[in-house]
């Protein structure tokens, strides 16, 4: 316990996936948390708000007294039992509040009264957050190689196969396009950045890193945006472009968006509700780009999508989806990406099929 109390090497704590018993209010946790943290609040949102109002009007002593009145009796005991259970499950864990102040110290003292010595994070979440921001800035200074290519080129798979690859879309829980959402909701911006920082630290720690391999992304991946320090470095980075046959790209997209997403939705929600969610997911993706398609073209593709869904529901075949996917690629996604890539033409260092790019990466 004493050694752990003194061991406030924040990077080491993040690298080790150290369990954190985060006693901040749920709203604070949702706004930003560290990977591996579990939220077991000392005060719920309404209790925290009441204490905050009391602090502004009557001062610190009155606010502290109100906090103890709000968290007492059965409520206090229930929360204490939850903290005890968490520590028993994660005996190498740490208590964490916003700044390592009263909340984590109060919980620590209450646990000590039951015979449990649980260390706390000095400086709290704010200190860990600052460490994550600094780590991302520092590690983003290393050389970067981008993997580019049109939709369906298998870029994400290629990045994942690299020992120095960072799957930005996986971290963001989004595949980048209007159809990119997954069944897992995206994290808050701060939580995404924290998760990215920990991933960079881990990859950097386990090898002699010459450079990062990242997918060529825009500023945003769904609702998350890339840290500006990383985005600036990516804008200057060399690019290896995957140029696979159109038919192969279609098969990848069929597998990812029509077969796998249908499976994931039905597995999560059951056949009927899963099918409805899958259908709404595809319609939402098309609806999101309706203005760029033009309303007439959007209506035409929506009708084609409806027919494709009816065919898939009745026969299980996904062939009908090609009738709207092919024009969507030809008229929207491919021209858009090629226009963006043309602006970065000076950064392109290699072009080839997926396998040729994979072989080229190995030779670097």
Swiss-Prot record:
InterPro entries: Rhodanese-like_dom, Rhodanese-like_dom_sf, SelU. Disulfide bonds: none annotated. Keywords: Selenium, Transferase. PROSITE patterns: RHODANESE_3. One of its GO terms (biological process) is tRNA wobble uridine modification. Pfam families: Rhodanese. Gene3D superfamilies: Rhodanese-like domain. The keyword Heme does not apply. It is an enzyme of class 2 (transferase). It catalyses: 5-methylaminomethyl-2-thiouridine(34) in tRNA + selenophosphate + (2E)-geranyl diphosphate + H2O + H(+) = 5-methylaminomethyl-2-selenouridine(34) in tRNA + (2E)-thiogeraniol + phosphate + diphosphate; 5-methylaminomethyl-2-thiouridine(34) in tRNA + (2E)-geranyl diphosphate = 5-methylaminomethyl-S-(2E)-geranyl-thiouridine(34) in tRNA + diphosphate; 5-methylaminomethyl-S-(2E)-geranyl-thiouridine(34) in tRNA + selenophosphate + H(+) = 5-methylaminomethyl-2-(Se-phospho)selenouridine(34) in tRNA + (2E)-thiogeraniol; 5-methylaminomethyl-2-(Se-phospho)selenouridine(34) in tRNA + H2O = 5-methylaminomethyl-2-selenouridine(34) in tRNA + phosphate. One of its GO terms (molecular function) is transferase activity, transferring alkyl or aryl (other than methyl) groups. Residues 14-137 form the Rhodanese domain. The active site is at 97 (s-selanylcysteine intermediate). Its EC number is 2.9.1.3. Belongs to the SelU family. NCBIfam families: PRK11784.1-1, PRK11784.1-3, tRNA_sel_U_synt. Involved in the post-transcriptional modification of the uridine at the wobble position (U34) of tRNA(Lys), tRNA(Glu) and tRNA(Gln). Catalyzes the conversion of 2-thiouridine (S2U-RNA) to 2-selenouridine (Se2U-RNA). Acts in a two-step process involving geranylation of 2-thiouridine (S2U) to S-geranyl-2-thiouridine (geS2U) and subsequent selenation of the latter derivative to 2-selenouridine (Se2U) in the tRNA chain. Monomer. This is tRNA 2-selenouridine synthase. It comes from Salmonella enteritidis PT4 (strain P125109). The gene is selU.
